[in-house]
Regions:
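Intrinsically disordered, low-complexity terminal tails and inter-domain linkers enriched
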Residues: 71-91, 178-180
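Short phosphate-coordinating micro-motif centered on Lys-Gly-acidic
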Residues: 3, 103-108, 114-180
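Hydrophobic anchor at the beta1->P-loop junction of P-loop NTPases
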Residues: 30-32
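Short beta-strand-centered segment that lines the nucleotide-binding/catalytic pocket of NTP-utilizing
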Residues: 53-69
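N-terminal pre-Walker A segment at the start of P-loop NTPase domains
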Residues: 1-19
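Conserved lysine of the Walker
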Residues: 40
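Phosphate-binding P-loop
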Residues: 21-27
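Walker A (P-loop) phosphate-binding loop of P-loop NTPases
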Residues: 37
């Protein structure tokens, strides 16, 4: 399933992230691709807000990974193919990866990062195209492109039943709300 959205501002990109983040329950893998300045980190900031994370979110360019935890437990939402899980914290974990400085995808395996992609937290990976061979078949890809100084194109590509249902709910919630 594919969904194309045009964002007209950073604020709108962040709101789109919030709407998607509100639907995440754990175990999701979201892969972000786009050139510098397309809004990958802005979208991730919105995702974190939607998940109930109040920390300042910035790109982990030099550390490859930053971990955040929401202050609230996720509200149960029935999404096909998803099994509710217990989290060791009050809320949901967000694992924010940035592969911009990654030289070899094997480094991620050597560092044990692959384990995160099959865990109970939400993984968001910026510059995901640098490690295409590592990703599970089922996932949500988001490709961002600059259209103008403030305008961005976001293409959501869902692979697998869980991610298709997630994208359907996101589309319904996004277009059912005005002022996006």
């Amino acid at each position: 399933m594919t969904l194309d959205i045009i964002s007209h501002s950073l604020t709108q990109t962040q709101r789109l992230g919030m709407r998607l983040g509100d639907l995440l329950r754990g175990g999701e893998l979201i892969l972000l691709d786009g050139q510098l300045g397309t809004g990958k980190t802005t979208l991730t900031q919105g995702l974190a807000q939607g998940m109930g994370i109040t920390d300042v979110i910035n790109s982990p360019t030099f550390t490859l990974l930053k971990e955040y935890h929401s202050s609230v437990s996720p509200v149960p939402v029935q999404i096909q193919g998803m099994v509710p899980s217990q989290h060791p914290y009050d809320g949901l974990a967000l694992y924010h990866f940035d592969l911009y400085r990654l030289d070899d995808p094997e480094e991620m395996i050597d560092l044990g990062f692959e384990d995160y992609f099959y865990g109970s937290g939400v993984c968001v990976v910026e510059w995901a195209d640098k490690a295409n061979l590592l990703w599970p078949a089922e996932r949500l890809n988001i490709r961002l492109k600059v259209l103008s100084e403030t305008k961005r194109s976001l293409r959501f590509i869902a692979t697998g039943a869980h991610y298709c249902e997630l994208l359907r709910l996101f589309q319904k919630n996004t277009y059912a709300t005005t002022g996006s």
